[in-house]
Amino acid sequence: MPQLNPAPWFTILVFSWMIFLAIIPTKVMGHTSPNDSSPLSTEKHKTESWDWPWQ
């Protein structure tokens, strides 16, 4: 039964993972986002503590 012979399928598996792990991430990470987010304000928000009404 030829489908049980791992030799051709293993090489296809290895080469496909080499493509996924080497070529595709470099192409995807090469693009820059047009919307670079920057914080509008760096001041700390004032949070006041308050009591629960049932305590």
Curated annotation (Swiss-Prot):
Top-rank lineage group of the source organism: Eukaryota
Transmembrane segments: 4-24
Region entry Disordered, spans: 32-55
Biased composition (Polar residues): 32-41
Pfam family, one: ATP-synt_8
Annotated compartments: Mitochondrion membrane
GO biological process: proton motive force-driven ATP synthesis
Molecular functions (GO terms): proton transmembrane transporter activity
Alphabetical keyword list: ATP synthesis, CF(0), Hydrogen ion transport, Ion transport, Membrane, Mitochondrion, Transmembrane, Transmembrane helix, Transport
Bilayer topology annotation: Single-pass membrane protein
Classification via InterPro entries: ATP8_metazoa, ATPase_protein_8
GO cellular component: mitochondrial membrane; proton-transporting ATP synthase complex
Family: Belongs to the ATPase protein 8 family.
Function of the protein: Subunit 8, of the mitochondrial membrane ATP synthase complex (F(1)F(0) ATP synthase or Complex V) that produces ATP from ADP in the presence of a proton gradient across the membrane which is generated by electron transport complexes of the respiratory chain. ATP synthase complex consist of a soluble F(1) head domain - the catalytic core - and a membrane F(1) domain - the membrane proton channel. These two domains are linked by a central stalk rotating inside the F(1) region and a stationary peripheral stalk.
Subunit structure: Component of the ATP synthase complex composed at least of ATP5F1A/subunit alpha, ATP5F1B/subunit beta, ATP5MC1/subunit c (homooctomer), MT-ATP6/subunit a, MT-ATP8/subunit 8, ATP5ME/subunit e, ATP5MF/subunit f, ATP5MG/subunit g, ATP5MK/subunit k, ATP5MJ/subunit j, ATP5F1C/subunit gamma, ATP5F1D/subunit delta, ATP5F1E/subunit epsilon, ATP5PF/subunit F6, ATP5PB/subunit b, ATP5PD/subunit d, ATP5PO/subunit OSCP.
PANTHER family, per the entry: ATP SYNTHASE PROTEIN 8
Protein name: ATP synthase F(0) complex subunit 8
The encoding gene: mt-atp8
